[in-house]
């Protein structure tokens, strides 16, 4: 078995590699892993983690070896590594949460549990579903609408002097809420077609996204089903009331939308989802596991048990 760590040193607020490299070596020694079976690499450019993961699984495949690859960074780094490794059936991918956003792991456990490197090295492997979209694969959540607009707008405000991440996020929210919030969408869910004026549509494999929004509190990553949440057009005053409920995951319980929100939020279990603006000349901002941009559509389908995830031993034992 080979153990391969890919560290994104610019994820989060400081260079985590200075802490992680010696800690990884210490944990590997404690777990009896030989130096020859351990590789540690640092990324140095966008998408580098994906390239390094492809290289690692290619080398393992040549020797017909099992390999565990750990992505140290945020959800973006994890997605790059996972999609780079998912086509090799003897590869499994773990996540060390050292980024500014680590929503994916919340579907399984806590940041502290996933930061325990020894427990990660002793962990178990769980097969999970993936979402296939026109913009690539996602493990967690894809969306279109207000939430994606906010995330897409953050970099613009970060370029303003003395405007940090938190302030940029707040300014982007204000800009989106004061602009055109809803889009008339054509939605196709497993062949069932309808139109809605919606502020957002979330297509969920995992439960959390957007820095802690619990969009799909009962979603399972291994059930072959996407949990689709459609939030219909509402006034700014109602958004202020509904948003905290949606963030806390209190819009959904026992397999259905709670009665007080059933005219605002709709839920659909799905295998495939296709969303596009009714106006063919209009685009929608699309989010695929945190990567956002304008597009003509969001097309998503579930790919059952298509990736292998490493869970820390304590987390894995609780799952079994």
How does the language model describe each region?
Residues 6-8, 96, 231:
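Short hydrophobic segments within beta-strands
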Residues 9, 72-74, 98:
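Glycine-rich beta-strand-to-loop/alpha-helix junction loops that act as flexible
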Residues 1-69, 115, 316, 320:
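ATP/NTP phosphate-donor binding region
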Residues 143, 147, 202-216, 292:
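Glycine-rich phosphate/pyrophosphate-binding beta-alpha loops
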Residues 77-89:
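Short Gly/Thr/Asp-enriched flexible loops that form oxyanion-binding sites at enzyme active sites
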Residues 158-168, 212, 217-240:
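Gly/Ser/Thr-rich active-site loops/lids in small-molecule metabolic enzymes
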Residues 43, 87-199:
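Catalytic core of DAGKc-family lipid kinases
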């Amino acid at each position: 078995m080979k153990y391969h760590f890919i560290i994104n040193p610019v994820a989060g607020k400081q260079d985590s590699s200075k802490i992680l490299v010696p800690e990884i070596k210490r944990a590997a020694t404690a777990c009896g892993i030989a130096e020859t079976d351990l590789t540690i690499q640092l990324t140095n450019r966008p998408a580098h983690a994906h390239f390094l993961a492809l290289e690692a699984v290619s080398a393992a495949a040549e020797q017909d070896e099992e390999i565990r690859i750990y992505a140290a960074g945020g959800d973006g780094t994890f997605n790059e590594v996972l999609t780079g490794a998912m086509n090799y059936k003897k590869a499994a991918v773990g996540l060390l949460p050292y980024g500014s956003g680590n929503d994916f792991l919340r579907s399984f456990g806590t940041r502290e549990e996933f930061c325990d490197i020894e427990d990660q090295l002793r962990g178990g492997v769980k097969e999970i579903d993936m979402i296939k979209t026109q913009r690539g694969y996602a493990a967690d959540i894809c969306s279109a609408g207000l939430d994606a607009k906010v995330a897409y707008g953050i970099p613009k405000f970060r370029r303003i002097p003395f405007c940090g991440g938190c302030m940029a996020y707040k300014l982007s929210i204000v800009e989106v809420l004061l602009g055109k919030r809803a889009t008339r969408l054509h939605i196709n869910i497993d062949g069932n077609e309808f139109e809605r004026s919606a502020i957002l549509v979330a297509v969920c494999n995992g439960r959390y996204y957007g820095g802690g929004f619990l969009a799909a509190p009962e979603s399972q990553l291994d059930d072959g089903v996407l949990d689709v949440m459609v939030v219909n057009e509402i006034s700014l005053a109602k958004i202020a009331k509904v948003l905290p409920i949606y963030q806390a995951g209190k819009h959904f319980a026992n397999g259905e939308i709670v009665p007080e929100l059933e005219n605002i939020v709709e839920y659909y279990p799905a295998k495939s989802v296709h969303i596009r603006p009714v106006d063919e000349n209009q685009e929608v901002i699309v989010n695929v596991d945190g990567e956002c941009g304008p597009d003509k559509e969001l097309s998503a389908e579930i790919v059952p048990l298509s990736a292998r995830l490493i869970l820390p031993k304590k987390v894995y034992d609780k799952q079994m």
